[in-house]
Amino acid sequence: MIKKILTTCFGLVFGFCVFGVGLVAIAILVTYPKLPSLDSLQHYQPKMPLTIYSADGEVIGMYGEQRREFTKIGDFPEVLRNAVIAAEDKRFYRHWGVDVWGVARAAVGNVVSGSVQSGASTITQQVAKNFYLSSEKTFTRKFNEVLLAYKIEQSLSKDKILELYFNQIYLGQRAYGFASAAQIYFNKNVRDLTLAEAAMLAGLPKAPSAYNPIVNPERAKLRQKYILNNMLEEKMITVQQRDQALNEELHYERFVRKIDQSALYVAEMVRQELYEKYGEDAYTQGFKVYTTVRADHQKVATEALRKALRNFDRGSSYRGAENYIDLSKSEDVEETVSQYLSGLYTVDKMVPAVVLDVTKKKNVVIQLPGGRRVTLDRRALGFAARAVNNEKMGEDRIRRGAVIRVKNNGGRWAVVQEPLLQGALVSLDAKTGAVRALVGGYDFHSKTFNRAVQAMRQPGSTFKPFVYSAALSKGMTASTVVNDAPISLPGKGPNGSVWTPKNSDGRYSGYITLRQALTASKNMVSIRILMSIGVGYAQQYIRRFGFRSSELPASLSMALGTGETTPLKVAEAYSVFANGGYRVSSHVIDKIYDRDGRLRAQMQPLVAGQNAPQAIDPRNAYIMYKIMQDVVRVGTARGAAALGRTDIAGKTGTTNDNKDAWFVGFNPDVVTAVYIGFDKPKSMGRVGYGGTIAVPVWVDYMRFALKGKQGKGMKMPEGVVSSNGEYYMKERMVTDPGLTLDNSGIAPQPSRRAKEDDGGAAEGGRQAADDEVRQDMQETPVLPSNTGSKQQQLDSLF
């Protein structure tokens, strides 16, 4: 009877086993063909960030969620490979993808618990899961994982599997792969890890947060000890090595990639261009983009602009806290503030801080990045003292939770604020259009709006040279005499009213030459010139410089620069004067490399004198250059003469009520445009002239940019002649008699006080010297041939 029962039981068990094996076999036969292809493993391309460099190799931008450096398995030190194997898969080199003994142990534990509580995933299984499967704990997912692991083992070598694991695994702190983790946790190359450091990192794959040595040092230490004991058990290390590693004091030094903060506007321009071409792949394919800007030029340009904006803001009242965080519900105020401050940047030595308390004496206790606390007394508060708990300032008052800026002045902290005034600087290679420096504002972090390329502003008198160039092309000369006298134009004002434009300084010089008029920036002369050549002709001609029709008003006000354009476009247009009349295109990208170091794209720029289209007659460009040299020598931009160079030319610009101030200066090699103004246009007051606020920025930058470069000046082209100190096109030494100039009107005589006063010239500079007025020679001119620009042929960047 017992024998019969045993036989029956054995038969049932055997039957169930056969049935189970059959089911498993069927499941394998059904599932295995449906497993995903291993192409992503065999041709592994990890997500790598977009990195942007200056021309001299400085990192100026990095974009992408995953910070990763792909490393060959042979470049990982043996001590790290052993530590990971000891921690995750001691039988890695001895199994076929699944550790059967480990599975058995885990199965027993899961049966006892009644659910999937633990596994025995090998490194190969983890690779399968990380690349193809979810993290859910189900028997179906585990079954697929086992089959995938087997398939991987049949297709890839053990070292290749290990290489995939070492590069793909997430290890906390935004570190993907052990090479990245070595930098982030210890700030060192993975090849330089000690045994103790390797064992610590090897503990992270199991639970990156739980075993993070920075956040949970005690748990991480226990995990490290476990791994070292495993290594000893596997005869990977000796007892002495284990003990030394356990006693080694580890120093955690988070790696912070230094990104040049002065070129963030340039980096953002590149990011946008790459995103337009590649979409989200731009952030994962490991592109390395080299730009045309130099890091040292960027630093000088940024400081030059910031200096002017700071100086303008000096003496302004305190505008209030820049932000506010609610600390009333925080259980750990110090940690809350630290987390908040970690997302802010120190800009121009202005350090972000959060107010923790305001004392009865109205002293302010602040917390700085790093946790340091500082008490600011009334002296340290300075101009911000009135804002302390001032209910009249509403949300902008200084109170608990207020975010403010402070600066360390010789060991004493004081409240400061970022200036409200903004600006931009653009510097181009005149012959190629390559951007050498570009600053889009005071601080990219607070306002990413790039004023160099996005701010549409009136260029004011910096636009006049284009009108004068059109006049030379139409039949005038640099010595054409025009009456600088008031003029009234019926029907040209708002709603058909009378337009009575004025010179900005209220002074009129009577009959003066074009050279004198541009040097002193005379509005009346510019208007009379445009009346003579015609608005339509001027629009058509000025488009040769790269301006769009929408930027050129179809009215006489165009002569005063009332159209709107960007600083970059103005700099690009001035390059036509600088390079002898050729149209070049601005660009910031020079080369693009892929993750493997292969050159993917290289800019082939239009070059003046080679493949760039001729925009204007080179003689026209030369004569304009010589006229604008006088603007620097004796005119509204005399501040630029501080460089002591004879090859500089340029033009200032100031719009109505001093809302926008400009200076564009150049020599035959470099064009630099500076714009200053508020984001919400308003008057800058008495100092808001191009000659007083924009020129100093230009000088500070160009002093560096032109250092060591000889000032040769522009070479006079063929067909230009000089007579009585003036320059003419050979065939045109007189004004075209077919042109009609309205020289009516009488210039009012200045008062005796005005005669004695040197100041108050156009745009706030000193009055330009009154050269002797030259009368035109009465000869019949020969008009030049058509010099309209060709269609640009800029090679595709991608």
UniProtKB/Swiss-Prot annotation:
Catalytic residues identified in the record: E88 (proton donor), S461 (acyl-ester intermediate)
Alphabetized SUPFAM superfamilies for the sequence: beta-lactamase/transpeptidase-like (SSF56601), Lysozyme-like (SSF53955)
GO biological process: cell wall organization; peptidoglycan biosynthetic process; proteolysis; regulation of cell shape; response to antibiotic
Region of interest (Disordered), residue spans: 738-798
Polar residues composition-biased segments: 783-798
Transmembrane segments: 10-30
Source taxon at top rank: Bacteria
Cited InterPro entries: Beta-lactam/transpept-like, Glyco_trans_51, Glycosyltr_51/Transpeptidase, Lysozyme-like_dom_sf, PBP_transglycosylase, PCB_OB, PCN-bd_Tpept
Cellular component terms per the entry's GO annotation: outer membrane-bounded periplasmic space; plasma membrane
Periplasmic side: 31-798
Topology feature Cytoplasmic, residues: 1-9
Catalytic activity field: [GlcNAc-(1->4)-Mur2Ac(oyl-L-Ala-gamma-D-Glu-L-Lys-D-Ala-D-Ala)](n)-di-trans,octa-cis-undecaprenyl diphosphate + beta-D-GlcNAc-(1->4)-Mur2Ac(oyl-L-Ala-gamma-D-Glu-L-Lys-D-Ala-D-Ala)-di-trans,octa-cis-undecaprenyl diphosphate = [GlcNAc-(1->4)-Mur2Ac(oyl-L-Ala-gamma-D-Glu-L-Lys-D-Ala-D-Ala)](n+1)-di-trans,octa-cis-undecaprenyl diphosphate + di-trans,octa-cis-undecaprenyl diphosphate + H(+); Preferential cleavage: (Ac)2-L-Lys-D-Ala-|-D-Ala. Also transpeptidation of peptidyl-alanyl moieties that are N-acyl substituents of D-alanine
GO MF annotation, one: peptidoglycan glycosyltransferase activity
Pfam (any one): Transgly
Membrane-related topology note: Single-pass type II membrane protein
Keywords associated with the record: Antibiotic resistance, Carboxypeptidase, Cell inner membrane, Cell membrane, Cell shape, Cell wall biogenesis/degradation, Glycosyltransferase, Hydrolase, Membrane, Multifunctional enzyme, Peptidoglycan synthesis, Protease, Signal-anchor, Transferase, Transmembrane, Transmembrane helix
Pathway(s) of this molecule: Cell wall biogenesis; peptidoglycan biosynthesis
Principal subcellular localization: membrane
Localization in the cell: Cell inner membrane
EC number from the UniProt entry: 2.4.99.28, 3.4.16.4
Biased composition (Basic and acidic residues): 768-777
UniProt-annotated stretches for the region Transpeptidase: 378-700
Annotated segments matching region Transglycosylase: 50-218
Entry's family note: In the N-terminal section; belongs to the glycosyltransferase 51 family.
Summary of the function given for this chain in its UniProt record: Cell wall formation. Synthesis of cross-linked peptidoglycan from the lipid intermediates. The enzyme has a penicillin-insensitive transglycosylase N-terminal domain (formation of linear glycan strands) and a penicillin-sensitive transpeptidase C-terminal domain (cross-linking of the peptide subunits).
Protein name: Penicillin-binding protein 1A
Taxonomic source organism: Neisseria meningitidis serogroup B (strain ATCC BAA-335 / MC58)
